């Protein structure tokens, strides 16, 4: 399930975090199967000539824009037939500790551990309000998650909303990929919910050095953040936060309020 809109970004972000692509040039075309006239994305320099025989072309009144056909560039290996969201899960055990950490470690092309960026507690404390102010659909409905990508100085680069928080993050990362901001060096990913293992995995795959959430992280999310060298912040509310990993990126010297930032 996803909220319609920014679907090309969603596809790019999902394929990035599943280690299928690392640049926009790895995708030749992406178009809505049931709308041949509109909704086409063309790759950087490859003509748009998809094989529409695989797509059901609907009448105008039937177009739902719910199926996006993505064609990888020539020479790109196709994902396995069992590829699905969360490549580190299995039906028998779900997300499995050490195996999951190892899978992310082997797949990521942009490990964030070496990113020297630092962020002040005051900058971090301002992010939730900035994210909320940019959530237009949430303000109208109260029903969507959001993710936003910020610079280390607190500039909001992009925000995306979706009924699924994983989709919101994928849309943000797809935007970053299409705008040549992957790896997202020096950036902070802010999410409106909790920090799950899956969201930490997505941040790591995109080379993002800091992930902040308004709620708690899972224990496996903390383990992955420590293993990958990512700064993980939870319960970022008002003037308080918990830092679960990567405390060296919090510039406490720049703040007079040491109580802003408590190690977890």
PLM regions with names:
Residues 33, 62-71, 183-218:
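Cysteine/selenocysteine-centered motifs that mediate thiol-based redox chemistry or coordinate metal-sulfur cofactors
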Residues 1-44, 48-51, 59-147, 151-152, ...:
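Intrinsically disordered, low-complexity regions enriched in acidic/Ser/Thr/Pro/Gln residues
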Residues 100, 123, 127-130, 143-146, ...:
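General structural feature for long, well-ordered alpha-helical segments within catalytic domains
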Residues 199-264:
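Conserved catalytic-core subdomain
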Residues 19, 100, 108, 135, ...:
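Structural signal for hydrophobic packing residues in well-ordered secondary-structure cores
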Residues 67-69, 93-94, 146-148, 155-158, ...:
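Structural motif
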Residues 137-193, 200:
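Glycine- and Gly-Pro-enriched alpha-helical subdomains that act as flexible
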